[in-house]
Amino acid sequence: MANCFVGDIQGCYDDLRRLLDLAKFDPAKDVLWLCGDLVARGPDSLKTLRYVKSLGQRAVTVLGNHDLHLLAVADGVAPLKKKDKLQALMEAPDRDELLTWLRHRPLLAEHPDLPIMMVHAGISPAWDARTARNCAREVESLLRGDQYSWLLHNMYGDLPDGWSEDLAGIERYRYIINTFTRMRFCYFDGRLEFKCKKGPTESTPGLRPWFEQREHHMDDPILVFGHWAALMGNTGRNDIKALDTGCVWGNSLTLWRYEDDALIATPCPTHAK
């Protein structure tokens, strides 16, 4: 059995299937791990959701910012934008079934037997692994419960940008969501910054990638994430794997296989802007 981790798909269904063929992924025995942002910007968000859902327990995916935004659009919180290419999904007969399934995906996923943790954007430098797990469960329970509409209506915003155990209510939930789904850079004091989407060498002075501010402990799991295409897979750390390589922007879709540490990529030139 192989554990195959894939970066942001964003509706690029054909590229995903081509990559899985290249990696010889076998859904009868392998497990597909997806770093979130299954939908938006690419041509086939509907096919992508249907396929991943059809894999059942052979697919593990976490929520990304585009996935949450889709849920917000469906709930009337945000407008449907043409550039997101979600119209077919919104009009699909199985829309509600797919969105309910998506709403029940986690913010953080872990392998039950291997030292691997997966999120979409990252884990706050202020959190250890236990805090990250607990924070993820807090928001997941809201998304899966009666308060999910309230949460979607109030999740947008950049503040608070710093963590405190005293945070409560929507301010606490917003920080948790932003950390797991939007974060790239932090200020040196640990506060989150959301405007810069460039790579570390092009960033504004005073900012550092979130993973450079995380201390490494020997018993920490390998952390796998997506979201940050400008990294092109480079974190400079063996314990932190970045897998978003900009498929929807015409670069490539990348798969990392845990068992042999193989990186497999397929070019996606048809999406070049």
From Swiss-Prot:
Keyword Hydrolase: yes
Record keywords: Hydrolase
Gene Ontology molecular functions: bis(5'-nucleosyl)-tetraphosphatase (symmetrical) activity
Catalysed reactions listed for this entry: P(1),P(4)-bis(5'-adenosyl) tetraphosphate + H2O = 2 ADP + 2 H(+)
Xref: Pfam families: Metallophos
Keyword Transmembrane applies: no
Enzyme Commission numbers on file: 3.6.1.41
Database matches in InterPro entries: ApaH (IPR004617), Calcineurin-like_PHP_ApaH (IPR004843), Metallo-depent_PP-like (IPR029052)
Bridged cysteine pairs (disulfide): none
Annotated PANTHER family: CYTOCHROME C5, PTHR40942
Family label: Belongs to the Ap4A hydrolase family.
HAMAP family to which the protein is assigned, alphabetical: ApaH (MF_00199)
Annotated function: Hydrolyzes diadenosine 5',5'''-P1,P4-tetraphosphate to yield ADP.
Name of the protein described by the UniProt record: Bis(5'-nucleosyl)-tetraphosphatase, symmetrical
Originating organism: Aeromonas salmonicida (strain A449)
